[in-house]
Amino acid sequence: MLRGQRHGQLGWHRPAAGLGGLVTSLMLACACAASCRETCCPVGPSGLRCTRAGTLNTLRGLRGAGNLTELYVENQRDLQRLEFEDLQGLGELRSLTIVKSGLRFVAPDAFHFTPRLSHLNLSSNALESLSWKTVQGLSLQDLTLSGNPLHCSCALLWLQRWEQEDLCGVYTQKLQGSGSGDQFLPLGHNNSCGVPSVKIQMPNDSVEVGDDVFLQCQVEGQALQQADWILTELEGTATMKKSGDLPSLGLTLVNVTSDLNKKNVTCWAENDVGRAEVSVQVSVSFPASVHLGKAVEQHHWCIPFSVDGQPAPSLRWFFNGSVLNETSFIFTQFLESALTNETMRHGCLRLNQPTHVNNGNYTLLAANPYGQAAASIMAAFMDNPFEFNPEDPIPVSFSPVDTNSTSRDPVEKKDETPFGVSVAVGLAVSAALFLSALLLVLNKCGQRSKFGINRPAVLAPEDGLAMSLHFMTLGGSSLSPTEGKGSGLQGHIMENPQYFSDTCVHHIKRQDIILKWELGEGAFGKVFLAECYNLLNDQDKMLVAVKALKETSENARQDFHREAELLTMLQHQHIVRFFGVCTEGGPLLMVFEYMRHGDLNRFLRSHGPDAKLLAGGEDVAPGPLGLGQLLAVASQVAAGMVYLASLHFVHRDLATRNCLVGQGLVVKIGDFGMSRDIYSTDYYRVGGRTMLPIRWMPPESILYRKFSTESDVWSFGVVLWEIFTYGKQPWYQLSNTEAIECITQGRELERPRACPPDVYAIMRGCWQREPQQRLSMKDVHARLQALAQAPPSYLDVLG
């Protein structure tokens, strides 16, 4: 016999407060039901209590069954069985209690009609066993079986397993099997108990379309009850014929098709202990097939394709009949399919900013051992700007001035004008017109630049990533407070007309953006984490960061659109990706790539030697970043700066706070305009609104407000110092005025403890007082890449 030693209750347990609340509600209900003399009395709006002794022998046909959520039955010695149909109609039942009654048997499917049942109390009855099937599929929180004469058998092994796995408190009751006298043995000592063993034997030879396939399911185990096949995924793929019985079941698939691939064939078996099942997939070989679609313009151009075949075919692209060698600008990308049970694969041939040179015939060849297939498509990405092939010789034609001339020399005429000369003259005139237009634009842009150039502050609080970037044409730029209010930077900073076009900004529907929660706030407005649908073809939805514009003035809207145009142009793996804007309704939204680990400064601090001190009791990273990881971070920031420098853009506010960290230690340049609010101590306020990051600025920027690509190099040297100090503030021991004095007098930041001499040499190369003597960003990046690929052996003897 099995006995229950009650240490609370057997099985799952609700929280003490919840269980106490249930008991309290039942006690209060007793007062209301005291006057009820029927077999079952209502308790509250959806409860029923049946406690009159010996008046109930079945639970069928209870009054108000459709609305019941709690049913309490007690002292019913004639209630001995709970069958399949007894609880029919009680679909809303959450709690069932049958105690101190004569319940001897509960059918395996007794709770088929009560899928929401979560609290089951069958204590103090006459139960000798309870099948695992009885509670299968229920989300129980409480199961109470104490006070029942449970027999020690394999049928109760499932209960002991729950006890061993500590499922919601089952361990609180010890189940033991009775031996001789008062000796009790643990239920687990019965080694003959176990779920069935199921194995499917597959055909040894390869299967092709049209073949017949025979599968055999072998079942082993004690007290086997039933077994069968699950073939729901195979409908329509073949004719199925079952054969045999326990312990060996057969299945014949007649005239199989390629649709059988990736479909599960499942065999299951049950006994008193539990259920076991195993699934296999039959691989049907068939030749490759391919389909190509027309080129579509997305973020990159895409030539969509679909390929099928088993085994999966290899792919090769051809362009105008020649093998196409893939690069980082032209490459194959497969799309993740939501369907995992098909052999067909979908993808794109991605082309990054293709030109007329890429116009032509594209052919995809797919091949596997059973055959090959090819498909071709013509793609045109851009009209040819030339009326002739620049590789062909220019034809020369002659038109005589005097039609009466007797000379017929086809080689040369004195007054004839060759076509090549006409082309040259035309190009020269076009160049002159272009230069004239350029000067006009230069003059106008100097007067009405909308990228913060004519603002009263060098770095106003509302400036974001784009507001800190400027296109340089004639070397460095300087900005005095009076210039900021006046004519701007005539002759020094211009907006390149070819970079800004409203048509290139991607517009996102507001209905596709679902805001989740706020990430931060700046003077411009707020930044939210959001889900964006239909943004990328290979993802139904993705997390993004959404910047909402607070100000609604016309100037703010114009700045918004100009910033969007600029950000659309900046496309680099180490610049935070800008997806587009939403201008439907209000507020105006910008959608950026979401970088899950936040800004680089916080990331460095949380992964540094002082992480525990700064965490304030929160979980911290297991250890500080290693030398190789620090070099990788620095190299990525440098790569982004090389890209900006190649476009002649000046950042002006480069710092770790304005870099973001994503999954896999991917670092990108970009901020959402929040850094001046979050890191206000990093900025030095001059006058009313001007805030300068003086600790990152070179002498010429502090003294003369001169910003250039060389001033960005200086700032990068400070960023490198931040990285190797795990996010410390430059000149942290000095006030702003003291820091200005040190920088302008030529003092340098000391070498960090974790910094190898080679890296510090790069920092010093960035901090040369004369801008022309500083390392270029390209050289800095090359040196860091070399160090990252082979990190130097460096031992911090002081640490």
From Swiss-Prot:
Residue ranges crossing the lipid bilayer per the database entry: 419-442
Site residues, Interaction with PLCG1: 794
Span of the signal peptide: 1-32
Site (Interaction with SHC1) residue list: 499
Bilayer topology annotation: Single-pass type I membrane protein
Disulfide bonds: 36-41, 40-50, 154-193, 217-267, 302-348
EC number in record: 2.7.10.1
InterPro entries found in the cross-reference section: Ig-like_dom (IPR007110), Ig-like_dom_sf (IPR036179), Ig-like_fold (IPR013783), Ig_I-set (IPR013098), Ig_sub (IPR003599), Kinase-like_dom_sf (IPR011009), Leu-rich_rpt (IPR001611), LRR_dom_sf (IPR032675)
Family affiliation: Belongs to the protein kinase superfamily. Tyr protein kinase family. Insulin receptor subfamily.
Quaternary structure, from the entry: Exists in a dynamic equilibrium between monomeric (low affinity) and dimeric (high affinity) structures. Homodimerization is induced by binding of a NGF dimer. Found in a complex, at least composed of KIDINS220, MAGI2, NTRK1 and RAPGEF2; the complex is mainly formed at late endosomes in a nerve growth factor (NGF)-dependent manner. Interacts with RAPGEF2; the interaction is strengthened after NGF stimulation. Interacts with SQSTM1; bridges NTRK1 to NGFR.
Protein name (Swiss-Prot/TrEMBL): High affinity nerve growth factor receptor
UniProt organism field: Rattus norvegicus (Rat)
Taxonomic lineage from the root: Eukaryota, Metazoa, Chordata, Craniata, Vertebrata
